């Protein structure tokens, strides 16, 4: 999962609109949409702002390292997938008999 997808998954897991999410972390709506659509990537300053907020700290290790530490309160967002990989067939690996 890439950075834009991770941002979107975090926001949706928290049940927030783009405007609400942007307001909470103190960035503009247009900046957030540019991150979610992959036009820009958040820099270090924005990433620090995001994970300094208590509501989003639990996603830090997942977001940065694709890891989690439940004992430290780290979790993976509830929405593990946003859409299915278009290159993957739901029948991949099945025996079709042909």
What are these regions (language model features)?
Residues 1-13, 97-98:
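A short, Lys/Arg-rich alpha-helix, primarily the initiator
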Residues 11, 22, 51:
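The alpha-helix within a helix-turn-helix
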Residues 15-34:
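Short alpha-helical DNA-recognition segment
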Residues 34, 52, 64-65:
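Phosphate-coordinating loops and pocket residues in cytosolic domains that bind phosphorylated ligands
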Residues 37:
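Short, conserved catalytic or interaction motifs in soluble domains
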Residues 40-41:
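A secondary-structure capping/hinge motif
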Residues 45-61:
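DNA major-groove recognition helix of helix-turn-helix/homeodomain DNA-binding modules
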Residues 60-98:
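Short, charged recognition helix plus adjacent turn
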């Amino acid at each position: 999962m890439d950075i834009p997808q991770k941002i979107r998954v975090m926001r949706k897991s928290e049940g927030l609109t783009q405007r609400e999410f942007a307001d909470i972390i103190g960035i503009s709506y247009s900046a957030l949409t540019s991150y979610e659509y992959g036009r820009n990537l958040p820099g270090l300053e924005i990433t620090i702002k995001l994970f300094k907020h208590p509501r989003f700290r639990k996603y830090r290790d997942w977001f940065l390292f694709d890891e989690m530490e439940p004992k430290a309160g780290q979790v993976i967002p509830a929405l593990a997938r946003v859409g299915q990989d278009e290159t993957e067939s739901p029948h991949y690996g099945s025996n079709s008999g042909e």
